[in-house]
């Protein structure tokens, strides 16, 4: 497929993924400051680390989420606000059916992972729970890759 085959799709993804993260952070920080701190967990994507063909606009927008997470983590750390992200791999869900890369026969996606099964939404819970509890009070600006071993950094 040609690069940016849909300009509207590119703009939408940037607005939702990058601008949405920035806007949400700006909206919640005042309340967190009043409470003496807080935790923000953004949702990035493992695609940023392996750049799948045909998804450049999506991958770039999720790369922006990772960059914003790092910057916001540095900017807000001294205010006791931790900003981190989770970067999931392709997750089997109703929303993914019919999208690029979703393979109901569980072919290439599973084969490229160290953990040989499809990822399901529940696989994100442990990472999310860690990032919202006091266990992660000294962690900020980080992105946890929850991709079943597809990408190792």
Place the predicted regions along the sequence by residue:
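Active-site helix of classical SDR
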Residues: 25, 61, 69
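Alpha-helical segment proximal to the catalytic Tyr-Lys
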Residues: 30, 74-78, 137
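Single conserved hydrophobic/aromatic residue that forms the stacking wall/gate
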Residues: 1-8, 12
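A conserved structural motif in NAD(P)-dependent oxidoreductases
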Residues: 113-124
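Residue(s) in the substrate-gating loop at a strand-loop-helix junction
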Residues: 45
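Short C-terminal tail/terminal secondary-structure segment
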Residues: 50, 129, 140-153
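Active-site loop-to-helix junction immediately N-terminal to the catalytic Tyr of the SDR YXXXK motif
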Residues: 51-59, 71
């Amino acid at each position: 497929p040609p690069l940016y085959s849909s300009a509207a799709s590119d703009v939408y993804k940037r607005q939702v993924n990058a601008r949405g993260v920035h806007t949400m952070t700006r909206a919640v920080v005042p309340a967190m400051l009043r409470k003496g701190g807080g935790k923000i967990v953004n949702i990035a994507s493992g695609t940023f680390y392996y750049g799948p063909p045909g998804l450049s606009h999506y991958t770039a927008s999720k790369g922006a989420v990772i960059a914003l997470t790092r910057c916001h983590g540095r900017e807000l750390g001294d205010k006791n606000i931790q900003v981190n992200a989770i970067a999931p791999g392709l997750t089997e869900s109703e929303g993914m059916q019919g999208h690029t890369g979703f393979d109901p026969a569980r072919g290439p996606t599973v084969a490229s992972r160290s953990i040989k099964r499809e990822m399901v939404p529940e696989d994100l819970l442990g990472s999310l729970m860690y990032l919202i509890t006091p266990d992660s009070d000294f962690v900020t600006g980080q992105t946890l890759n929850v991709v079943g071993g597809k990408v190792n950094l």
